[in-house]
Amino acid sequence: PEVLEKLLKALALQIGCEVSYNELAGLVGVSKQTVENYVQLLEKAFIIFRLGPFSRNLRNELKKLRKIYFYDTGIRNALINNFNPFDLRTDVGNLWENFMISERIKYNNSRGLDANMYFWRTTQKQEIDYVEEKGNVLSAFEFKWKKDSFKKPKIFLDAYPGSAIELVNKGSYKKFIGID
């Protein structure tokens, strides 16, 4: 139906960003509950997946919003009718983030690795694209297509001693998805 197409397109335009069901409901013209139902259906059909915020109750960590990604970035690109090469795109960072996280999920699943997956962000807009918790081990990853460095959020490292933050870029991604 038209509502589902509108919702999918809205989600496709928001990959890598926090998503509000209330905002989506307003964009699509349906209730928040209808948006939630469609999102659950799309998840069960393995079209999209959600990442919730990682928080251990620090006052300045986001706790309510979520990010939604597509398992297949080709479907995402078809929804927004953008098949341009990376050099001609304005959404490279978000597309790279989506691709890396979806490939990491496949990597973990194919090896039977159980991981809790999140993103992390503070009210001061410090963020980490992907946080993975396996057992008691906390690993954080920042995805950058072109950059070779980034500023690690000290507040995260201080709040979660023993955790590590790694950069995943086009030169290092193979290790992250297990193909090196």
Question: Where are the language model's segments positioned?
Answer:
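Active-site ExK catalytic segment of metal-dependent nucleases
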Residues: 133-148
